[in-house]
Amino acid sequence: MINYKSYKASCSKGTDSKPFLFVIFYITVVSNAYLFNVPCFHFIFKEEHTMLEDMKKNSNLTFTENGAVTNGTTGSDCLDLFSGIGAFRYKSDGEIIKSFIKAFTENPDMAMKILFFGRDVREGLGERKVFRTIISWLGNNEPKSIIKNIEYIAEYGRYDDLLSLLDTKCEKEVISFLKVQFDKDIDAMNSGKAVSLLGKWLPSVNASNKETVKTGKRIAKVFNLTDEKYRKSLSALRAKIKIIENNLREKDYTFDYKKQPSRALFKYRMAFMNNDNERYSEFLANVSKGKAKLNTNNIYPYELIEPYLSTSFLHNEQITFTEAEKETLNATWASFPDFCNDEDTLAVIDTSGSMYCCSKPTPASVALSLGLYFAEHNKGKFKNHFIEFSNKPQLIEIKGETFADRLRYISQFNEIANTNIEAVFNLILDTAVKGNYSQEDLPKKLILISDMEFDYCVENANETNFNNAKKAFEEKGYKLPNIIFWNVASRNSNQPVTKNEQGVALVSGVTPRLFSMVASGELSPYKFMIETISNKRYAKIVA
């Protein structure tokens, strides 16, 4: 305890006030660090190496599938969750829940914010399956954390996410929430006012899927409605919402394409081509001329690439498109928002064999789509270029006027090689040294889009690839560019760096929205996570 009166008296006698100011500063930093659970002293004091810390560091070292030294964890369970949640779709439910339990135990509030960031379809990663798996676990094991956030689940995702909480300890609260919203929508509809999207996502009692029918009947019963009354109510709500499925079922193609949601426009594009080609082509032509807008908010770049690249890349087949497909693909791709800035950044894409081993979407399609997107939208000197991993990395210049042309062009460079990250670093460093280029000539950032299963480092197999690269650049008088490790298939939860590494960010997922998030300032993994989930959008999410 500080005796302020005694200290003030000593100051009046000419005692130096600097120690007191330092104590006040120390207390301020400690209190803030405690509130936000942020490790803050690494920038004030030099970290002391103890036997315990060194044992932790050594026991954390592990190997990638290709024999490279890497880290088993970042040193923060929350950061492990944050850095991988966008790539968890290939994991089993048990593995997903295991990762979340660790993070939730470390910091419940932070884990919940990461969870909702992972689901957020508008400003986050848009991961549906992972979110539903975790909230189902929470519903049985931490029901209070679900009840506090029930009203936000549909806001960040969809109303049918709530159905994952049936048969959990939160079922009563979920049913009550759905019933209140259902009644509000019925009243609003009868008054000619706008309604929510609940009617679109509630299960039908006359669907073709037996499980959907079973759940629909269950909802109707707890809503105190007969199956017939429930069915008619949903039909009326869906007519009010004007969901396009009603039109397609009735073969009614009088709807306005400009007013359709992005997911529906993409999902039913073949039906439009086959049954309403003249009007649909006219709409696409107007999009190309800037006279109409094609919404792409809930579409991801890999969805345009997956049907064409997954097979052709594996079997060296040529990509072919019909003219109608070309029109649709070109208009959709050109309508994606631009999330890139004018920084000199270069993407590096992993198309090794392991990137084709998972179910759809294949990680290779995700990586290629993001690489192509970023190369096109890059405004720096590396515009329209990306690198593919290999023993001899390929720097590919993208050519072609339209998306279809460019997609067909990059498919000719398929090698399905290995993930030699050391060779990528050497390509950049050797070019800089031989050409006597300045630091300013190098890329400011490298975005490494991969499953993180890198090859072992030939130069020093006892070090991580990142540490080896950093040393190699320093020895030649250069600084390693900032690195964005972008995970698209987290099979083994390896971490290329730990939480406080400077000049690095750890991200994951399929959305190009992340490009805008990693565009600013100095990076470190933990700091980047804190900045992301401290966004006011997630302030209301608590455990």
Could you describe each region identified by the protein language model?
Residues 9-10, 17-20, 34-36:
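Short, often N-terminal, low-complexity regions
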Residues 39-366, 376-543:
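Long lumenal/extracellular ectodomains of secretory and single-pass membrane proteins
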Residues 12, 24-25:
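Low-complexity intrinsically disordered segments
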Residues 4-7, 26, 34, 42, ...:
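Low-complexity, intrinsically disordered or signal/transmembrane-proximal segments
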